[in-house]
Amino acid sequence: MLARIAALTERPRSFIRSFKYRRTDSIPNSSRREMDFTDLDSNATKCVNLRLCSVSGCMTEILEIRADRPSFHVVFVPGNPGVITFYKEFVESLFKSLGGTASVSAVGASGHTEKNWEHGKLYSLQEQIDHKIEFIKVQNIEAPLVLVGHSIGSYIALEMLRRLPEKAMYCIGLYPFLALNLQSKKQAVIVKVIMSRVLSTMVTLFVASLRLLPRQVLRLISELSNGKSWSNTAHEACCSHLPQYHTIRNVLYMARTEFIKLSETPDWEFMRENQEKISFLYGIDDHWGPLQMFEEVSRQASGIALSIEREGHTHGFCCTEAGSIWVARHIASLIKNKLAR
């Protein structure tokens, strides 16, 4: 069940955690602009922080790495579940792949936190979009923005591009969920659950009841359900956040509002108008971002840079170290090519 929920779709000092990552030596600005991925110093270290930030009164989990002299700022929006700790290895790999030229802020979804800071308040897709816009205002980010979104986060990133046209220089969607897939049996099942108050309540209560189990048992369930390919970080994120009653309620409620909104036709006109600023990465077997959508984007907005990942990673790339590293390097390559124009 934890695996299925994970597939749906990113105050106290004791909450703040630090991790180690590697970074490059200081290099000239010209080299920074070219983003040389090979000249990395294996001896230098710095901390990546998981911190709480109040955004419009909503306590938000932020996974962040700050560059000393950033030439741009990457703001990452997760999919649903919007548990940002799933993306630890990805954020580390992205910062490293960019050679320390950019700060990276990964912004968790409102209400998808480990603790129930918002006392059970539910957040819709539109409220998640507003939340990400407000984060940028609160942080007073001055450097040019590169917006990166995963799954429904890709849709959110596009809406951020719409509302921040002067500040956002690039928008990258990873395994993007931009419209309903009427051919997907999995999505048909999900629709029945999230649109039914009875079924969604039953799922919520069942998943939330799992937190009563010892942590070791929860971890075993996660490992048996998701397999050995998942990273330790992904298993921990699954066990710490998803069984929380307030989190799973928000996951299902957000999914409900996603399916309602994405039943509409995508705004192709907006994508055509901004096609030089947009890139999408699709997967081979991904019902959230199927290849027929890849083909439709290609027809509707031919100037959008489209790629297909053929390395065997999944929609949940962030749950494996190999997937996190590959996608991070792909993003760095896209940005490098964009800046070289």
Positions of PLM-derived features:
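Short, surface-exposed "cap/lid" segments of acyl-processing enzymes
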Residues: 52-114
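Flexible "cap/lid" loop of the alpha/beta hydrolase fold
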Residues: 162, 166-202
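Active-site loop/oxyanion-hole signature of alpha/beta-hydrolase fold enzymes
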Residues: 106-146
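Catalytic active-site module of serine/aspartate enzymes centered on a nucleophile-bearing elbow/loop
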Residues: 3, 276, 302-341
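N-terminal cap/lid segment of alpha/beta-hydrolase-fold proteins
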Residues: 34-59
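Conserved alpha/beta-hydrolase catalytic His-Asp/Glu region
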Residues: 211-253, 263-265
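Gly/Ala-rich beta-loop-alpha elbow adjacent to hydrolase catalytic centers
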Residues: 148-153, 157
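Conserved serine/cysteine hydrolase catalytic core
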Residues: 243-299, 308-309
